[in-house]
Amino acid sequence: VKTPLKSNVSFRSVTTVKKLIPTNSKVNSFLFYSGEVEASLAATGRQMMAHTNRYAIYEFWMHLLADRHALARAAAHVHPTIDDAQFYFLQEDWTNYKDAKLRAALFFIMNRSSSTGLVSCGELSRDNFNPAAFALLKRFDVENLYPVYDKDDDLIQNIKDASDTEYTLLPVGNYSFNLFEYGKSRAADVTPVHHRDLAEFVGQSDQKVVLMYKNHPALFDLYKEHNIQMVDAYGRPTDDRGRCEEMTIANF
């Protein structure tokens, strides 16, 4: 199952995650965005409770799963009206439209048209918005995927408050030291992650937690007590840190 959204962070380590989280498991997954990871796990028999604390993301997915054809029609109607100047205006303003289906359609258009895969930022890249994108939108049909809107801005608090499941998954993506972030405004489609706080939570949690990260040297020390599995740029398992592209980290 291929998601209709462009991934802001694309993962090659889903096979590793599938080995850690068995089929028929119930999973709370956080940082839900493109659905790349969650849809793949749902399509192979895992019940995915896909959490986001950004309403715009939740709203898009609810419209997609409720009636993908209606969403495709709305996107096809509005897309020709968006010129270059309006694209950059909408990056800051699309959430202010009153019509929910229009907002969801704009989310899809802006995501596919953004060089970053983020609706709120990136350069205009029209090559990614083509007939194939509409085809993916119309074809997307997956069971066992349930979007959940978390109202707390604190990611870790939302994890603690979630309904009890055996597994918790976080496709985090890129690591940072969270420098100079205090007081910065938050985009409508970006969830802040405080990586050291997350590591502390993982170390103390009774839940089985799986993290997906792009390679970063700091992670080897931060998670030295945990199970770290590496894959290369082609998704193949490797023990060579020099060839490591992604890291899957588990506290079990």
Model-derived features: where do they sit?
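Long, positively charged, glycine-interspersed low-complexity recognition regions
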Residues: 188-252
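Short active-site oxyanion
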Residues: 23-27, 46-47, 142-146, 203-209
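Short, polar loop motifs at secondary-structure junctions
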Residues: 32-36, 132-135, 213-217
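Conserved S-adenosyl-L-methionine
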Residues: 10, 16-82
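Short catalytic/ligand-binding loop motif for oxyanion handling, primarily in non-cytosolic enzymes
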Residues: 37-40, 57-59, 116-119, 176-179, ...
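SAM-dependent nucleic-acid methyltransferase catalytic core
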Residues: 1-23, 68-183, 244
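Short His-Asn-centered micro-motif
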Residues: 29-33, 51-52, 148-151, 170-172, ...
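Short loop/helix-cap segments at secondary-structure boundaries that form the rim of catalytic
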Residues: 40-44, 139-140, 218-225
